[in-house]
Amino acid sequence: MRETLTNLNSIIPTAGNATRLYPHTLFQQKAMLPMGSPDKRVVDSAIDIAQQTNETYMTLHWDEEYTKPLLGHIATRNSEITTFRDRHIMGAASLIEFSDELFENDIEKDTIILPADHIIEGLDVEDFYLTHKNLGNDVTILLVPPKDYGQYVGVSENTAVDISTDRSSFTLSSSGIYIIRNKAMLEWAAMEKKQGWAGEIRSMLQDFITPNVYKGQASVYKLHESGYWDDVGTLRRYYLNNMRLSGGENVIDNNVELSANAKIRRSIVLGGVAVTDLYRIDKEIVSQNDNILYRTRIEL
């Protein structure tokens, strides 16, 4: 680890239900879906970045059975990750629930929030962190070239001055990746508790990031033009990013029963599926639970 990053921790939230990827995440967690090959998982991009930081924490889905594959995968990555399990779907309220453990002991440090379903390449974590420290605000937002979804950020010099879903006025997108002062997170958690928070769901964007933008406390950092970022939490984007990484080849997960004459083209077949000679699979995401086969055709 670079000495600069000894004061930077990381959090990987993995506790959501991933409803945008239904039905394929009904029985397997989004973080554990293959990404580009059967040896890579969606969450690996976040873990790769987190391994450059001092301490890594992960919030887990409340269902212990659902998270067993993820915990097993972490063990194979030789990653020292401390986990915290949500008691129900909480969103960013996990950071309130576990604020003492996540931030109290490292109050003078900072934390990078790394969503488990984001693919990111070419991020200079050290430069991102140094920019955050030099600008001195509570939050620094990682910006990327404009996407056709999500939040767009208005910028003046190195400060975010507006954030909106309206693309017409802005030329940069928020990646949903942030570096945050631990002290600011503790203050937010304390305020929520004082106002009567009792476990209700919270949004990192709406309840923490956006208020900081309008208080003038959000800096920005632009991903290098040679970098790459995408949120793979929808069926279409999950499919397209797999095809990008596989060079257009099929992504056949582990534990797939594949007959010798199966006809599969530019598709993703998730673990547990038995593909016989009768199937013709073309530009699809396919999963199976018990005897129910789920097929999603992606229109390009």
Give, region by region, the residue ranges found by the protein language model.
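Short beta-strand segments
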Residues: Y57-T59, I141-L143, K222
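Short beta-strand-to-turn element immediately C-terminal to the catalytic PLP-Schiff-base lysine
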Residues: L143-V144, V153-S156, I179-I180, V286-S287
